[in-house]
Amino acid sequence: MLMVISPAKTLDYETPPVTHRFTQPQYLDHAQELIQQLRQLTPLQISELMKLSDKLAGLNAARYASWHPEFTPENAKQALLAFKGDVYTGLNAEDFGEDDFAFAQDHLCMLSGLYGVLRPLDLMQPYRLEMGTRLANARGKDLYAFWGERISQWLNEALAAQGDDVLLNLASNEYFGAVKRKALQARVIDTEFKDLKNGQYKIISFYAKKARGMMARYVIRERLRDPAGLKDFNAHGYYFSAEQSGPDQLVFLRDAPQD
C-alpha cells in the first residue's frame, strides 16, 4: 500500500532533523526548470500570481534566487521533517525511529508543485509553489499540465516496486488533481474524516487535515500493508462508518474533538 499526502505551506528549517538518513528527489531536473522560470518574476508578480503578502513574496523571491540542485543536509532538509501544518501535526514524524522512517520511505509520498513527488527522506530546499498555481510554462497553462502523467507514472513504478496495487489517497483535491487516475495501475482508496457539528457530520478542514496525518501515522506505526486494516483506525475518537463508506471510499466519523 502506498499513501499520498499534500505538502504544507509552513516549513521548519530550524529544528534539527531526528534522522541523518537522506535521499535525493527524483525530479530535480524538472524542479530546476520551474525555478528558472520563477526567477524571472519580480516580487510583485509573485505576490499577484500566488496571492501572497509583500513580505512572503519577497521571501520566496529570495528562496528561488538561492535555490540550487546540489542538495546536502547543510542546505536542505528531509521533506517529511521540513513540512509543518495540520497534516504533519497529525503525522508527528519527530518521534519516528529509524524503522519507521524506513517503512515510510517505501509507503508514503508527498505531492509537490515544485518537486512533483517527494519521498519522506528526500532532501528539499524551501519553496512556495502550490499545485493549483496558474503558472504558464512550456508544457501548458498550469502546473497540472507541467507535470502531466509524470506523477502517475512515478506512483505506478513505486507500487510495482513494492509488489502492490493499492493507493491510499490522503491528499487534498488540489494535489490529487495532479494524479491521472485513469493512468494508475492501482486500486485507489479515498478517505473522508467528518466531525459532528450542529447535529450533522461535516468535513471540518482543520480536523480533516490532521486526521489524514494521523491515518498516515497509523499505517506507518502498524506497518500496515492490507487495506482491510484501515477500518480499525480509531485515533483521537474517530471510528469507521460502514453505513457512509463504500468499497473504495472510507468514511470516519467523530462525535467530539479529543485534542
From Swiss-Prot:
Entry superkingdom: Bacteria
GO biological process: response to hydroperoxide
InterPro entries given in the database record: YaaA (IPR005583)
Pfam families, alphabetized: H2O2_YaaD (PF03883)
GO cellular component annotations of the record: cytosol
Listed HAMAP family: UPF0246
Similarity-based family: Belongs to the UPF0246 family.
NCBIfam families from the UniProt entry: PRK02101.1-1, PRK02101.1-3
Designated name of the protein: UPF0246 protein PA14_18590
